[in-house]
């Protein structure tokens, strides 16, 4: 299984969420609402979840092994950092005009 596409939108919120992503797996299956969170130990990826009646959050979809989790996290965070670099370049170019 490979992550074949990542669509990411940065968000400006008061909380720790930094972006929301959708990934495509093997050009065949899409998972929406993956969140990039700024945790105590750096950025991490949180899978889509919903709140249960007792207030807990349960993942709607999630990888079942650490290798797959790493592939997803690496792909999403790579795109997150790539977009950050693009925004910095665009900001610098706009300031240079």
UniProtKB/Swiss-Prot annotation:
Keyword terms: Cell cycle, Cell division, Septation, Sporulation
Organism expressing this protein natively: Bacillus cytotoxicus (strain DSM 22905 / CIP 110041 / 391-98 / NVH 391-98)
The family this protein is said to belong to: Belongs to the SpoVG family.
Gene3D superfamilies per the UniProt record, alphabetical: Stage V sporulation protein G (3.30.1120.40)
Protein name per the record: Putative septation protein SpoVG
One example of a Gene Ontology biological process annotation: division septum assembly
Coiled coil segments of this chain: none
Pfam families: SpoVG
InterPro entries: SpoVG, SpoVG_sf
Keyword Flavoprotein carried by entry: no
Function as written in the Swiss-Prot or TrEMBL entry: Essential for sporulation. Interferes with or is a negative regulator of the pathway leading to asymmetric septation.
Top-rank taxon: Bacteria
């Amino acid at each position: 299984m490979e992550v074949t596409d990542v669509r990411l939108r940065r968000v400006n919120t008061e909380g720790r969420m930094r972006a929301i992503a959708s990934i495509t797996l093997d050009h065949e299956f899409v998972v929406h609402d993956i969140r990039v969170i700024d945790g105590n130990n750096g950025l991490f990826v949180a899978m889509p979840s919903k709140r249960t009646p007792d207030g807990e959050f349960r993942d709607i979809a999630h990888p079942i092994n650490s290798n797959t989790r790493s592939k997803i996290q690496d792909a999403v965070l790579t795109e997150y950092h790539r977009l950050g670099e693009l925004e910095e370049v665009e900001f610098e170019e706009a300031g240079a005009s």
